[in-house]
Amino acid sequence: MMNVPSAAAASSCDDFGYNATPPPPPSLLPIMDQDGGGGSIQRDHHQHHNHQQLGYNLEPSSLALLPPSNAAAAAAHHATIAHASPHDLLQFYPTSHYLAAAGGAGGGGNPYSHFTAAAAAGSTFQSYYQQPPQDAPEYYFPTLVSSAEENMASFAATQLGLNLGYRTYFPPRGGYTYGHHPPRCQAEGCKADLSSAKRYHRRHKVCEHHSKAPVVVTAGGLHQRFCQQCSRFHLLDEFDDAKKSCRKRLADHNRRRRKSKPSDGEHSGEKRRAQANKSAATKDKAGSSSKNAGIGDGFETQLLGGAHMSKDQDQAMDLGEVVKEAVDPKGKASMQQQQQQAHHGIHQQSHQQHGFPFPSSSGSCLFPQSQGAVSSTDTSNIAQVQEPSLAFHQQHHQHSNILQLGQAMFDLDFDH
């Protein structure tokens, strides 16, 4: 029975020409069989054969996975493992074992020839797994990280925090990290744990008791004292009596506190000067404002005087016309002539005041009374024009001259 698979394998190799290295088989090979010697796997391309054992059906697709040269070898393998255990339904073979078996000289290049040799020697399928593998399997399954690697990873994670002498941002669960010790007092024989102390004491590595003690024995047997200004230990010679700060730092501290202050006399003098400057500035502002107000008032009085003068002139002219009409309502021609003469005299006076000569040829038609009145006021008007400061008085005299001219005209009408 054991020679049949080898003969079938040889015939299959001759038929298909696979005398050289056979093609690689699939890594998963389902092998199912219950019968002791009658069961076999046959490959047929034209017929579909269903092989049922223990309720499992082998489909044609699973049979097609086998190469043509291995059909007889598969039948021999089923015959070999049929007597081993009825419960071995699935078997997995690493690729390295398959290639090592395929490279053997026995079996004529058959990759499953070692099964036939084991069966001939009287061994079973279980003895195959008890033999040590020839080569390491190609499959690799990562195992769990060892405890040493975990410790290194946790140590690297704790180094992310800042080492400032107190708890870091990522404190470890088990307390302080590897190689790091809690801060302790540097006094000789104290070694107090400062993990729960204040930040100041942890930073300078001194407990609260020794930071205030007058004499502390430090490393080396030196008698020192903790300076609160320098935040370190000094020899007792550098302190004054029972002071908590050294002599040098205490002198600097007192110098800053006792800076020289200005005397009261100097301070009062500065205040007086500031007040004097302030009062002078206010006086200057008041004087400038009063000057501006005086200029504005003078300008306003000039404008008002000019307005009153124009009003008086208009009233005088209106009064003269009314008187003329009341005295001689019939002599309209003579009254018009007199009005023209009066206006001519007024224009002549205005021209003389501004320095413009007026022709005297037209003055022959005037009455002697009017000529005398005009000539008597010419000198005074010229003098007033030469003095700009007497402008207001000049305007007043002009009003009086106009009134005198009207009175002369009124008297002339009564004479006629």
UniProtKB/Swiss-Prot annotation:
Expressed in stems, leaf sheaths, and young panicles. Weakly expressed in ligules, auricles, and leaf sheaths at the basal region. A zinc finger (SBP-type) spans 182-260. The lineage of its organism: Eukaryota, Viridiplantae, Streptophyta, Embryophyta, Tracheophyta. InterPro entries: SBP-like (IPR044817), SBP_dom (IPR004333), SBP_sf (IPR036893). This is Squamosa promoter-binding-like protein 8. One of its GO terms (cellular component) is nucleus. It comes from Oryza sativa subsp. japonica (Rice). One of its GO terms (molecular function) is zinc ion binding. Gene3D superfamilies: Transcription factor, SBP-box domain. The gene is SPL8.
